[in-house]
Amino acid sequence: MLVFIDLDGTLTNTTHPGWRPYRDGQEDVDVNMVPVFQGAKEFIQECYNRGIHVVLVSDSHPRYVEPIRAMLGLQGIFLADKPNTQRLDEYIAVSPILQQELTHPENCYFIGDTKLDIEIGRKMRIRTILLQLYSVPDSDVDVHSGVGDRMGNLKMGPTYCAFSFTDVLQIFDDPDRKLYARESRIIGQESTNVIRFWEHSYSYDTKTAILCLARQEEGLCDSFARSDKYREISNPNRAPEFLDLLAGTLSSYLHFFESTCPPSIRWTHLTYLSDKSSTKPPEKMKQIFDRIQSGIPKAKLLTWLERNQGSLRNQVDYQSRRQFLVDFLRVDDGVDLRGANIIVIDDQLTTGATAHYVIKQFRDRGAKNVFFIAFFQMIMEVGDAVICPQCGQKMKIRRRARDGKRFYSCVPPQFGGQGCGNIINID
């Protein structure tokens, strides 16, 4: 097994701006003053006890990194230019051991606290772990690097989320069953893990949240994110067995979810973002919703106005999506939702505009707990830097809707790009 691991924010609590002069190599660091996260040293030793190769990957200055590396007992070290992988690729190219390990990417991990770490891991097509050991005040959140930006880091699409080094070791012990619920089910395993995209607690038994069961990747990623399975939802020829598996994943999760809720919460409504009359295939979500097995009473609480024009999918940003929802999506006026506890099902989470709007509408109508659960979260695109041989534009990885096969696309203007339309098959 091979583990690449970040330093600042992952092994040491040194993301605060006060550490910048040391990280930049402007001052010598006293290793006795470096705040090492609880369990970090023990984790490193346990990795070595298991025969795991560990490589420290940091973009801080060698003057700062080297003494901390020695203090932590780390054997491997590489100084990177995150999220650029060129120098890391060169480092791997002269190490037969690392090359051999990477022939089995399912046994390789990149562990870090920010989206830059996750992006590197995705470019390497290995498993990634977002390790969340600290919080920062809003004034210290760095949306560029991802320090403290929890939602931005989740949008990069880590394979796993962990909150301690014990969590990380448990992932190592049973990696396929620690995947997100839908991703684990695809490979024949069972998991109750979900992407906890957003949560807000009002009290012990009053909460709103946005959860996702799997990732829908764009571009490079590990092999467990499956955009092809998301696209199958909209396939007019989708098989009933596919719908059964999709609904089965959610049924299993709902059973687990209910068992973990406070006894005072009784879920009163299970609903879904209903299909528009123009939706293809017809009743796309209803056919899945009807297959869900749950003791929670089902109800159709959301409807689209028939006068709606266009598609939510074609609204390119958060604000335009929200305005489309304001104009055309309605909550059933005939249902008293005061004190209700509602779970809403949808096929995809993109910007979060739909989820937040629906949650607010139900809360405004008096609902207490509202959980929005999407089958797939669309994660950030990670490119492959392939250049079109015909026009010189960067190409993007896409999947064909009809068969799920990947290809490089020089995206033309009619699809939002500036390319010539050239296509190179991958699969």
Segment roles from a protein language model:
Residues 1-45, 49:
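Active-site neighborhood of HAD-like aspartate-dependent phosphohydrolases
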Residues 110-157:
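Acidic, Mg2+-coordinating phosphoryl-transfer loop and its flanking beta/alpha structural elements
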Residues 388-391, 410:
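Short cysteine-rich clusters marking metal-coordination/redox-active sites
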Residues 174-265, 306-334:
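Active-site-facing substrate-recognition patch
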Residues 413-427:
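Short metal-binding segments enriched for Cys and/or His
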Residues 62-109, 115:
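Substrate-recognition "cap/lid" segment bordering the active-site pocket of phosphatases
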Residues 105, 119, 123-135, 309-387:
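PRPP/pyrophosphate-binding module of the type I phosphoribosyltransferase fold
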Residues 28-55, 66, 86-89, 260-269, ...:
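Short, acidic loop-to-helix structural element flanking the phosphoryl-transfer center
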